């Protein structure tokens, strides 16, 4: 797959794969249509949906890793263009998209994996550096039964919502 053509679900997946310093596991929710991650980004735990292609809250994890970001003037109607260097990136990269967010995310994936990536590995997986290893259904069930992630904050919660029981 060409990184310049990634959109939606595939772009979300490859951004999660590119954040190997943040994401420990990738899962799929909503009948396999949405990327969900387990990880900790600089001390902030995350356990839930991860949709940077449609959410600046999720895309902020990429923006925070930009060491240099240059936004170019739009040359085509509706097209955004950026040039960026990222922490841990291999080189200065360019990204284009129908929005600045998509251009930024494509540039980030290109900085980690180059101009092309494989198809989405559509099963639960654990990240070890840039490698993804499938997690068996049994391992996923054992984690859920053990409750190791039950008390982690959800990114869907509201700021200031401590989720305490009403008095």
Give the label of every model feature segment.
Residues 1, 5, 40, 53, ...:
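Homeobox/homeodomain signature
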Residues 1-30, 35, 164-167:
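Extreme N-terminal leader/activation tails
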Residues 23-50, 77-97, 140-163:
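Short interaction-hotspot residues at assembly and binding interfaces
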Residues 49-101, 106-128:
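Positively charged, aromatic-enriched nucleic acid-contacting surfaces
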Residues 114-167:
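Intrinsically disordered, low-complexity charged/polar segments
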